[in-house]
């Protein structure tokens, strides 16, 4: 009986440590996206920030459409090692659509959106 209690305590402690480490790793990976970014082809700037371990990207400047300031461009950003997933707002569809993203070697965000047979890649450059 004593061995069983000891095993349960060990297992509980190990599980707790593993869970805390995985949460810490998740927040570290997603933190690579935090900050201000500019769309490479359009005059749109976003700020990516955490919201309880999930990243969100808010439009902070848009020279073409000032009414979009304060709206979400990215939601539900999660980390999967060196890649990220979430949803991006697609104005043509009027809704959020799943996307994949990664940080390139030059430190920029590469976002891939696939809608049916159509794929589109957009880039965001880090602003300092």
Residue ranges and their predicted role:
Residues 25-27:
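Boundary at the C-terminal end of the N-terminal hydrophobic targeting segment
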Residues 1, 21-22:
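Alpha-helical architecture
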């Amino acid at each position: 009986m004593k061995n069983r209690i000891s095993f349960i305590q060990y297992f509980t402690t190990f599980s707790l440590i593993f869970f805390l480490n995985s949460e810490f790793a998740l927040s570290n990976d997603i933190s690579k996206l935090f900050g201000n970014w500019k769309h490479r082809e359009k005059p749109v700037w976003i700020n990516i920030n955490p919201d309880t371990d999930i990243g969100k990207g808010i439009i902070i400047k848009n020279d073409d459409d000032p009414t979009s300031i304060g709206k979400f461009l990215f939601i539900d950003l999660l980390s999967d090692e060196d890649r990220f997933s979430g949803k991006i707002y697609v104005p043509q569809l009027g809704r959020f659509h799943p996307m994949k993203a990664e940080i390139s070697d030059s430190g920029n965000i590469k976002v891939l959106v696939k809608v049916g047979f159509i794929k589109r890649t957009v880039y965001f450059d880090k602003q300092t």
